Amino acid sequence: MKNCNQAINSREYKLILNINQFYDRTHTVERFGNLVGSLTQQFKGKVISQQTEEKYRHIYYLDTPNFDLRHHGFILRIRREKKYHQPKYQITLKHRESDRYLSASQDLSATKPGKTKFEEDIIPPFQSKFSQSISVTKDRQPNFENIKQVAKLFPGLKALDIPEQTSIGLVNNFRAFEVVKKLANLQFGDKHIVKTDLSLWYLNTTDNLPLIAEFSLKYRLPKKLLESPKKLEQFPMPMIQGTNYLFKALQQQREWINFHPMTKTAYVYG
């Protein structure tokens, strides 16, 4: 195990919404965005920019037949999206754990250049989980056939002692078409930004009603603090307080909230 004393560099608050609100996506997104803006102003925040961008991605998860990765707290996710009119494949290995030190101690190194993240995920009413991840982007679709091939990219998986020839395949034969809708950038009392977006999963591109709808509020540690070892995890207090108030207020909007939520990963694994 590596050093478990890692600093959190981002926080993400997640709400699973009532999918029955989303028959008309354009109208619903506008209504929900207005609600977020109104509540933000109640807590002395402001909307500094409205977003109109939609991203479209295809997503699937890979695991062994017995879900060995999942049982060890890992997920292996593939995202396909077009960038500059060319398909790109983002391969993400993530470890999620209630104990931040156990999550931080995992070896998520890669043999190719990748983007790393150690973040706190917050779900209702206010429960934290911690995830460490690394994402590697490739021009071609990955073709993993067994654990040995996955561990060639992510060598830390060798420590799980899963037999090398254990096959890897699509989890529950499930693929999602994802629409990511950027909503707005928010500020609470200072210049730091809280980003908001909606993630909607569909079985097909033509479906009207999503399988799952997730709203997220997220912020990263400002760059100047990331680069200062003496100021690690010093998230600005006005941003924390405002985001917390908004997150709790949204949970009171009964028509919008799914009170028997299932995360996206849980949905895939069933």
Predicted regions and their residues:
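Phosphate-end processing signature that detects enzymes handling 5′-triphosphorylated RNA
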Residues: M1-G270
